[in-house]
Amino acid sequence: MSSTFKQYWLPEKKGFDSLQLRNVPKETPRLGQILVRLKAVSLNWRDGIVAIGTYPFPGPDAVVPGSDGAGIVEEVGEGVTEWKVGDRVLANFTQDHIAGRLTRDIGLTQLGGEQQGLLGEFFIFPKTGVVKIPDYLSFEEASCLPCAALTAWNALYGLTPLRPGQTVLLQGTGGVSTFALQIAHVAGAKTIVTSSSDEKLEKAKALGATFGINYRKTADWAAEAMRITGGKGVDYIIEVGGTLTLQASFDAIGFNGQINCIGHITNPDPLGAGKDLRGPDASFLALDRLCVVRGVVVGSREQLQDMLDCFEAKKIRPVIDSVFSFDKTREAYDHLWSSTHTGKIVIQIP
C-alpha cells in the first residue's frame, strides 16, 4: 500500500489555473478519527470563489478545496466504535456543527474554505464528521448532498417548516435550488422556478416544478410571481443572487414569508470591488412585508441525518449534470463557472 496519495490544492488563490496536483503522506487515524478513501467529490459555487480568492470568510492562504465528498472507511482509530472498515460515508460540511445553532467558532470548521478540504484520494475525519450513506445512493450521488442539499433542507425546514400547499420560489437551477425544488415537490408545495433558459425550465418541470419564469423574456419575474399567486406573494424564496436580485425577492414575497439568503452570484466579490453595489433598503422592505430575511449556511449533522431519512423514504436522487474524472478536475471547475449546468457537477476519484 502506498504511503502517499494524490491531492489537489490551491497554493495561491488566483484562479482555476492555481489548482495543482501533488503527492502527500498518508497518515494513520488517531484517537477518535477515521481514514476515508474518497470515491467522489462534488463542486459548489463556493469552490469557484475560493479558487479565485473572493471567498468572503477567513481561511488559510493555501487550501485543499472541496467540501462535499463520499467514500469508504479504510481504517479506524482508537476508541472508534461507531464505524468499521468498509462503511460507506459522506462528509458533514461543517465538521463541528453537530446540532443546534451555528456559532462563529464552529463555522471555522467548514471543509474546503475555512479548513482543508476533500479533493484528494484520502481524508482523516473525526468520527462525528461523517454520516452513513443510504443504501440506494451511489458515491457520486451521495457526494452531492453535504452542502447544497442540506442548505435547501435548512432553508425549508430549519426555521418554520414548509407545509403542503405553500409556494416556494427558486432562483435558478443550480444545486441548492434544484434540491429545494425536489424537497418542496415531495412536501406537496407549489414551486416557481426562475431561469434564463427555457431548456432548464423544462428540466425543472420534469422534476415537479409547478411554474417556470424565463427572466430574459419576463424581466419582472417578481410581478409574474405575484400574478401566479393571485397577488398574495410566495411563502419561501431561495435567494441565491444577492445584491441584484434581492429587491425582486422583496417584491415577490408574501406577508409573513421567508427569504432565505443562500448566495450572492450576481456579486461574486461582496467584500472587494462589489462592495459598493447598492442594494435595497432591507429594513424597510422587511417591515413592509412582515417577512423574515434569513441567512442560511448549510446545516448541522443532526439536520443532515433528518434530511437523509426523508430522502431515503421518498427515494430522492440528486440531479447530476456531469461527472468528470479526477484528472479532469480543472475542466470541472470551468464547467461550474460557465453556469450552463443544471444540478450538480461531480468528480470521480479512482
Residue ranges and their predicted role:
Residues 1-70, 125, 216, 338, ...:
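Short N-terminal strand-loop motif that marks the start
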Residues 106-108, 187, 240-322, 348-350:
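Glycine-rich phosphate-binding loop and adjacent beta-alpha segment
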Residues 2-5, 231, 315-322, 330-350:
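C-terminal capping/lid region of NAD(P)-dependent oxidoreductase domains
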Residues 93-171, 199:
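NAD(P)H dinucleotide-binding glycine-rich loop of Rossmann-like/cofactor-binding domains
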Residues 25-41, 54-98, 114-116, 134-137:
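Glycine-rich beta-strand-centered segment in the early N-terminal region that forms part
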